Every structure is written in structure tokens, then in C-alpha cells.
């Protein structure tokens, strides 16, 4: 995860935490894109280049989480479903959990690792487990984007690693963040995890505002 994508992800997750969705990004041409909306109503409080297309990087994982939770809600899998770590998943770089090929994690733990560690290997394991393949999962992501009205988005992979035609906008990610809040209130705890323990290691959330900001 780059510094830029890290900042983007913190902005979106802050919105999920406090009820005001704040999105900020710098695209490849260094044009600022900003969006501040009220989560409960969708009212736009501030916008600057909100419809400007830009590369969403690790914020992509919010759509990965959304698509996974939709599958759970529709009964296609459960939070206890085991997701195997394939050779492709284990090979992902740079931010990863580092599971060996053949290991398996539950959907519940995978979502926690995704939100806290932004783990690219876990994102691929989720994609393969839910969609059968990265391409199949991308189709599900794009179907969800169209259904939500995210007209400026196209997803190619579940982790946001650089790929041609992988694109979104602050407006579209605001729509997605609101959908996560409104459609899955029972899973609100995923957006508030400050750390997870993996063996003897404690991994802190990249969003340093969790547990430090009221809301």
C-alpha cells in the first residue's frame, strides 16, 4: 500500500466510523478530488472534482468487502465458510498476511484482515472463494457497482493493485461507503477494529484514527 492509497483508505474508513463520509485523493495528474457527505442523508457538504476519475488503490477493498457481505446476505456462503489460500493468493505483494498455500481462513477472519491489514493475499482468497476467480469476482464487483449507481467505476481485481481500466471516483466511493453502512448495520463492527492478533504479532489498523476519534 502506498502512502497515497493509505491516506485514501483512512479517509473512507473514518467516514464509516463517524457518520460523515470524507473522501480525498490525488490522481495521477495531481488534481485534488474531495468529497464530504452526510452518511445518513447523502447530502453533499463539500465537493471538489468529485466525479474526476482516479485510481482507487486499496480503497478497492471496500467493494471487496461489500461484494462479500452481499454474498453472505444472499446465503451463498457464511461468515464461517473456509477460504483456501491458493498459490496465486500467496504470491500477492506487497502487503499481505503471508499464509502458506493450502491454509484456509474463515470469511469472518478474512474480512477482519482485509479491513485492518489491507492484505492483498486475503483479498485474492476472498475473490477466488466468492467469485471462483479474480475475473469472476470482478464481474460481481462491477455488477454491484452498476446496481448502486457507481457509473464512473470499473474494477479489475479485489485488492487495488495497479491494473489498466481499474478506476473510480470520490463520488462513487461515497455511494459505496453509504451502502456499506445502510445495507449491513449488523456488520458495523468490521469498520471499528483497531488491531488483530496473528500468532504472537499484533497488527494495528492503518486507520490510526480508530479508538482516537469520537464516533
What is the role of each PLM region?
Residues 13-24:
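Bacterial N-terminal signal peptides
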Residues 27-47:
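A short, well-structured edge-of-sheet supersecondary motif
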Residues 74-96, 192-200:
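Short, glycine/proline-biased beta-turn/loop segments that scaffold the active-site neighborhood
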Residues 107, 133-215:
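Penicillin-recognizing serine hydrolase domain
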